[in-house]
Amino acid sequence: MDGGYGSVTIVHDARSPEDVFQDFCGRRSGIVKALTIEVEKFYKQCDPEKENLCLYGLPNGTWAVTLPADEVPPELPEPALGINFARDGMQEKDWLSLIAVHSDSWLLSVAFYFGARFGFDKKARERLFMMTSSLPTVFEVVSGGVNTQSKTANGSSKNKSGSKPPKRPNSDSKPQKQVQAKYEEENGGRGNGGDEDQAETICGACGEAYANGEFWICCDICETWFHGKCVRITPAKAEHIKHYKCPGCSNKRTRE
């Protein structure tokens, strides 16, 4: 759908809200990665000595820090300009939160720009709005406010990981991974039929919901659940991690 950071190739065939939502999800995923998993790389690229820089989320789930589009007016709505200038003048978490808020605004503006260009009627716009609203905002992900009911009150020294992240706080003293493994062993490898509840758990990196059979791991600092693939952790690697810290928490502690 997009031909570059700030340009767009419009196809005049009928485009659905689902098409625009897919574009929205890709751009959002890229921005979330920049502000969480790949925050160290993002931080370095936002050099205050450089010119006005913008953070672009791309439809393929990647991101780019670069100069704004040369076209005036730009073909696509532009993200916040000059995000690099405030980097060293603010607390890092406040700086990232500010960028997240502006990014949320930009994502919606791009989505509804496409809606206008594709001639969406009232029902199509409402459907697009409902789909975009079904995901946590970038700000909620960055600030750690994503789906608080998915956090577990687990006092175990073993990191929380497994194939089924919980929907509600779990007072069980055993790690979720051990509980699930024991249940499946006793039931011949069958799940507990709670997929409907589990589907509401959101990955803190990509913002996608839980799907049956996926491996997830929970950060012991911020207690946010992640797809193992999103944070490059495999089930085998998780077995040797006593306390897991997600990339965002690790990077914050490194610079403090």
UniProtKB/Swiss-Prot annotation:
Q: Where in the cell is it found?
A: Nucleus
Any one biological process term the GO annotation gives: chromatin organization
- Gene Ontology CC: one annotated term: nucleus
Question: What does the UniProt keyword field contain?
Answer: Chromatin regulator, Metal-binding, Nucleus, Transcription, Transcription regulation, Zinc, Zinc-finger
Q: What is its main location?
A: nucleus
Q: Where is the composition biased (Low complexity)?
A: 154-164
Intrachain disulfide bonds: none
Q: Does the keyword Cell division apply?
A: no
**What does the record give as the function of this protein?**
Histone-binding component that specifically recognizes H3 tails trimethylated on 'Lys-4' (H3K4me3), which mark transcription start sites of virtually all active genes.
Q: Which family does it belong to?
A: Belongs to the Alfin family.
For this entry, the protein name equals PHD finger protein ALFIN-LIKE 4
Tell me the classification of the organism that encodes this protein: Eukaryota, Viridiplantae, Streptophyta, Embryophyta, Tracheophyta
